[in-house]
């Protein structure tokens, strides 16, 4: 999440349930879990994970799978990307930017295989695509913003929540010392 570097996901049990990778394997899917560079990745003093690094890594992985299709199980023409939050945004971008020429210089520099990067489908969950709004959330979550305001859901039912003509009751507050320490990790 947060456009950070992503390690390939291992199939395992999390919170007494199979994670998405294990669930897919249990249902007979072929899974290729891809690691990507993220916004905080450095090589010495230089940031090397800034945009478009993550999407270039994903496109390179798709090209690798397609280039090697005859040597592996499954069908590389049926690749379905899956992601949540920043991963959802990456999945959406991967699904809508097939063979886009804008990425070619980056893919060439990376040494990506000579193949197309079109995928069959994208499975997208709560994609973070409005970065202007997300910047505010990151500032609060990862910065020095300690005051908050949120909707008081305790007295709302579905009808009152969906009635946009009335402003909902709000709760305002400030993080306590423990919460401040956690938000700065």
Residue ranges of predicted features:
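Surface-exposed intrinsically disordered loops and tails
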Residues: 7-14, 105, 155-164
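Primarily recognizes the serine-hydrolase "nucleophile elbow" in alpha/beta-hydrolase
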Residues: 67-145
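Alpha/beta-hydrolase active-site loop
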Residues: 47-71
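Conserved alpha/beta-hydrolase
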Residues: 21-41
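Glycine-rich "HGGG/HGxG" loop immediately N-terminal to the catalytic nucleophile
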Residues: 38-47, 133-134
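Serine-hydrolase catalytic-loop signature spanning alpha/beta hydrolases and amidase-signature enzymes
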Residues: 2-8, 31, 64, 71
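Short, surface-exposed "cap/lid" segments of acyl-processing enzymes
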Residues: 1-23
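Non-catalytic, alpha-helical, charged scaffold/linker segments
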Residues: 125-127, 133-185
